[in-house]
UniProtKB/Swiss-Prot annotation:
GO terms for molecular function: mitogen-activated protein kinase binding; ubiquitin binding; zinc ion binding. The PB1 domain mediates interaction with SQSTM1. A zinc finger (ZZ-type) spans 213-265. GO terms for biological process: macroautophagy; negative regulation of osteoblast differentiation; regulation of bone mineralization; regulation of stress-activated MAPK cascade. Residues 935-979 form the UBA domain. Keywords: Cytoplasm, Cytoplasmic vesicle, Lysosome, Metal-binding, Phosphoprotein, Ubl conjugation, Zinc, Zinc-finger. This is Next to BRCA1 gene 1 protein. The gene is Nbr1. Signal peptide: none annotated. SUPFAM superfamilies: CAD & PB1 domains (SSF54277), RING/U-box (SSF57850), UBA-like (SSF46934). GO terms for cellular component: autophagosome; cytosol; late endosome; lysosome; M band; mitochondrial intermembrane space; nuclear body; peroxisomal membrane. Phosphorylated by GSK3A; this phosphorylation inhibits NBR1 involvement in the formation of ubiquitinated protein aggregates.
């Protein structure tokens, strides 16, 4: 069943809707009857609108069915219909042709063939349904005088327009056909030139000779043009005949002549040849047509030209944008082939816009900014070269200028850090050869091998007016031990020279450089270019200077060195093997370590201390402790012979990351035993010592170097000593050899450079950071003048322990940290918690203060220095032995029972603690203090810290605080273990 269709019928702005079904149930006669009744009409003409909004008449059942199908398919069951009042139903007595003519006259369209039969059917239906209407219609004569018989105005106007159009088209068609026949029948006749001005009648207008007669005189021969005519496209008044065009004629040869065979008759205008002069009409029409054609061609050509110019302009703009984008990202380029001299003005991207020619993509772009860059090519002394003590040597680095700025006297090789002694201490930077861009030269530095055996390095980097650039280069050597056949005099002489080298300040000698001749690029076999960029290294100069772009190669920031992978002890062995002066993209984060000489003695304090600090300490003139040293015998050297452990590597990495901005230290390693019983501290004027708890043992002496907090030139100095606990000279004399063997075999020395976030204005016990591996300690009364021996018997130290402290003897430490302060400070007695059972690498409460690694043994002195960056302001203490066990200290009985595995475990924990503490200090801000809490306010503060960290079980937190003697580090560790166990049990 077909869907129903809604008929929207409109008659004189009145619309009614009819709902019809399929054509079988509702026929066209029914629809027409409904429309007549609805609008009270007698005779109607119904039209519907198709999909193109064209009116189509409906006069039969077939047309009605087609309209319904169209409405179902294309118009959504909607059919728009228009009703026009008319007379298509007439009396049957009239002839059939009369009815058809009347219908055609009223509708304006030719009736269909079946219209007569339809009229009969509809007429009979209308007579049966509406009897009065047919009678009235039949009785009324078809007279146009009556008002009801007069057609509507729109119909009358339409017929008038239609009549005019038909007449005009008919006349034009007849004229065209007549002209064609005349042309084909009669030949062309010649005419005289005098006929140009003769009037032409209508009869002679269509003659063949006049058809091709232009009634225009030839501009060359002055004859009337008959036949083909040539007209200039630029000069409308210049016309020549076909004969003159074939021969020579006087006209501009650049002008194009248009060939015209016959005039074109415009059908829209009737030809009234009697009213117009015959010669002018065709010429004027042809001229207009030609002018329009010329204008059209010109406009078309102009549009094409403009379109081509627009396309070319777009291509130019696109290319310029591409080049500007490349200039903005010039820091990603390794080098620029378009070189620019230093004195030339700075190239700007705006200069590219001044070019009118389209730049090809392969054309090299001018550099946007002068770039400073360098690449390491070769060296003369590879890493790990063995040298004898005191040997003078010159280290050469072959460097290539990969930038576009020539190196001048402002370009120098600047010292960064290291412990290798220079030949002169006057300057810490050396001149480099004035290399042009792309050339290779030799940079040289003169060194002196230290007198003590060990591994020594010195790191350097190129600098231009204070801005560093290029890769970092270094010199790494291994100093062999003294031969056993050396006399004591030679040893003593080397000891004195080493002692002098220990007192060097950070000033280096400006060595002479051996500049090489300019080497072409093709001869360079090794080349490494920097690819990174650092916007922070751009410096603004004066108006006469330019802004130089310096690509960063090795920034050596603490964030880079303290990444998460450095905290993983599993990768330590992989990082121990470091190539010799590797290229830029493989530059290690630390000094090269020896891996090709297994018989080298463990560097210990020597390498770590010298590479970490990088600048020596000058001894005060009022020092009363002499820097006397003893050279070790070959037997003691063999006892302490070890490879550099992974723990030392991690510690050294962390240490260097924290001391990058601090002044370097140049003290050579000191591995000799000191006969002194203690180290004496000389503080500045007006400073009072403060006693603080110690947390380091003998075998791992610590040296803390704090960055300067005050302004440059601050003379304040904070030195912390950890001195021995028990001193009994008689017992030490008896056990001297025993301590020697133990300390030389198990001692490892560390220097921890405290970060800037460490609070040096307060004593170490009051600081907001605490050690992650600290031990319970006691205060010792050591306030007094410097140089006075301060110590307590072990029994006194144990008596002063709190009652709740019941730690084993091997975890007990009662060292003394003596801090010099500018004001008198009341001694504090803080307690340091015991060593945690296990330290997780992911502990959330890392501590910032770096501590020493717990090793069984007797206490050893450690010194804390505050290092100003200026070499002139650096002060220190004379130290005769740094990092070795004091031969006069007492050894505990239990220390003999610990093997090397326990020491290694302690070292691993210490290294991880140092790394985690430094990482948390740099990235996590000030952590929670780990001081034991006794008061209720302090307990509340610790509970609040635990709440902030996410541990909200108050009873569990309080119980664990009491269990661990208010050591928040151990509390957090156990809470994390509990949470992990709970998660694991619920997860699995």
């Amino acid at each position: 069943m077909e869907p129903q269709v809604t008929l929207n019928v409109t008659f004189k702005n009145e619309t009614q809707s009819f709902l019809v079904s399929d054509p079988e149930n509702t026929t066209w006669a029914d629809v027409e009857a409904m429309v007549k009744v609805s609008f009270d009409l007698n005779t109607i003409q119904i039209k519907y609108l198709d999909e193109e909004n064209e009116e189509i008449s409906i006069n039969s059942q077939g047309e009605y069915e087609e309209a319904l199908k169209m409405a179902n398919i294309k118009q959504g069951n909607q059919l728009q219909m228009q009703v026009h009042e008319g007379y298509h139903v007439v009396d049957e007595a009239l002839p059939k042709n009369v009815v058809e003519n009347q219908a055609a006259a009223r509708t304006g369209k030719k009736p269909l063939a079946h219209y007569s039969s339809l009229v009969r059917v509809l007429g009979s239906d209308m007579k049966t349904t509406e009897e009065p209407a047919p009678e009235q219609c039949s009785s009324a004569p078809c007279d146009t005088d009556q008002p009801q018989d007069k057609p509507p105005d729109w119909f009358t106007s339409y017929l008038e327009m239609f009549r005019e159009q038909v007449v005009k088209e008919t006349v034009e068609k007849l004229e065209q056909r007549l002209q064609e026949k005349l042309v084909l029948q009669k030949p062309l006749l010649s005419s005289s030139p005098t006929e140009v001005s003769m009037p032409i009648s209508e009869e002679t207008l269509f003659l063949p000779e006049n058809q091709f007669s232009w009634h225009i005189a030839c501009s060359h021969c002055q004859k009337r043009i008959v036949g083909v005519r040539y007209q200039c496209s630029l000069c409308p008044s210049y016309n020549i005949c076909e004969d003159c065009e074939a021969g020579p004629y006087t006209h501009d040869t650049n002008h194009v002549l248009l060939k015209l065979r016959r005039p074109v008759v415009i059908s829209s205008e009737p030809f009234f040849y009697s009213k117009y002069s015959a010669p002018r009409l065709p010429a004027a029409l042809e001229q207009v047509r030609l002018q329009k054609q010329v204008d059209k061609n010109f406009v078309k050509a102009e549009k094409q030209r403009l379109r081509a110019e627009k396309k070319q302009r777009k291509a130019e703009v696109k290319e310029l944008k591409k080049q500007l984008k490349l200039h903005r990202k010039i820091h990603l380029w390794n080098s620029i082939h378009g070189l620019q001299s230093p004195k030339s003005p700075l190239g700007r991207p705006e200069s590219l816009l001044q070019s009118n020619t389209l730049m090809l993509p392969l054309q090299p772009c001018a550099p946007v900014m002068p770039t400073l860059s360098a690449a390491f090519v070769d060296e003369n002394l590879p890493d790990g070269t063995h040298l004898q003590p005191g040997t003078k040597f010159i280290k050469h680095w072959r460097m290539k200028n990969t930038g576009n700025v020539k190196w001048n006297t402002d370009t120098k090789l600047k010292f960064m850090w290291g412990n290798l002694t220079l030949a002169s201490t006057e300057k810490k930077d050396v001149l480099v050869p004035c290399l042009k861009a792309g050339h290779v030269g030799v940079v040289s530095v003169e060194f002196i091998a230290p007198t003590l055996e060990g591994t020594y390095t010195s790191h350097w980097r190129l600098s231009h007016k204070g801005q560093q650039f290029g890769p970092r280069v270094w010199c790494s050597i291994i100093v062999d031990p003294f031969p056993s056949s050396e006399s004591p005099d030679n040893v003593e002489g080397d000891r004195i020279s080493s002692s002098k080298a220990d007192d060097f300040s950070c000033e280096q000698e400006e060595a002479f450089l051996l500049a090489e001749e300019e080497i072409p690029l093709g001869e360079v076999t090794k080349q490494t270019e920097g690819t990174g960029a650092s916007a922070s290294q751009k410096t603004r100069r004066a108006a006469s200077e330019r802004e130089l772009y310096i690509p960063s190669v090795d920034l050596l920031t603490a964030q880079d060195l303290l990444s998460f992978e450095l905290l993983d002890i599993n990768i330590v062995q992989e990082l121990e093997r470091v190539p010799h002066n590797t290229p830029v993209d493989m530059t290690p984060c630390m000094s090269p370590l020896p891996h090709d000489s297994p018989l080298i003695e463990k560097p210990g304090l020597g390498q770590i201390q010298e590479e970490s600090e990088g600048a020596g300490f000058k001894a005060p003139p009022d020092s009363t402790v002499s820097a006397k040293r003893k050279a070790e015998t070959p037997a003691s050297v063999e006892e302490t012979e070890e490879d550099l452990s992974g723990t030392q590597f991690v510690c050294e990495t962390v240490i260097r990351s924290l001391t990058l901005d601090a002044a370097p230290d140049h003290n050579p390693p000191c591995r000799q035993r000191s006969p002194q019983r203690e180290l004496q501290l000389y503080s500045t004027e007006g400073q009072q010592p403060l006693v603080l708890p110690g947390f380091c043992r003998k075998d791992s002496s610590l040296k803390f170097a704090l960055p300067e907090e005050g302004p440059r030139g601050d003379e304040r100095e904070e030195i912390v000593h950890i001195v021995e606990e028990e001193v009994v000279e008689e017992e030490e004399e008896v056990q001297d050899e025993e301590v020697q063997s133990q300390s030389s075999a198990s001692s490892e020395d560390y220097i921890i450079i405290l970060p800037e976030c460490f609070d040096t204005s307060r004593p170490l016990g009051d600081s907001m950071y605490s050690s992650a591996l600290s031990q319970p300690g006691l205060e010792r009364g050591a306030e007094g003048e410097p140089g006075i021996e301060s110590g307590l018997e072990p029994t006194e130290a144990r008596e002063r322990l709190p009652e709740r402290e019941s730690q084993p003897q091997e975890q007990s430490i009662s060292d003394i940290l003596t801090t010099s302060q500018p004001l008198d400070t009341v001694p504090l007695v803080p307690e340091v918690a015991g060593l945690p059972a296990a330290l997780s690498r992911s502990a959330p409460c890392g501590q910032c203060e770096s501590s020493g690694v717990d090793s069984p043994g007797v206490d050893s002195p450690a010194t804390m220095h505050e290092v100003p960056p200026a070499p002139d302001d650096i002060r220190g203490e004379p130290r005769g032995s740094t990092g070795l066990a004091n031969s006069r200290q007492r050894s505990c009985d239990h220390s003999r029972h610990h093997n090397g595995s326990s020491i290694a475990g302690g070292l691993v924990k210490g290294a991880l603690s140092v790394a985690a503490s430094a990482y948390k200090a740099l990235f996590s801000g000030p952590p929670v203090t780990a001081q034991p809490i006794v008061s209720e306010d302090q307990t509340t503060a610790l509970m609040a810290h635990l709440f902030e960290m996410g541990f909200c079980d108050r009873q569990l937190n309080l119980r664990l605080l009491r269990k661990h003697n208010y050591n928040i580090l151990q509390v957090v560790t156990e809470l994390l273990q509990v949470n992990n166990n709970d998660w694991y049990s619920h997860r699995y």
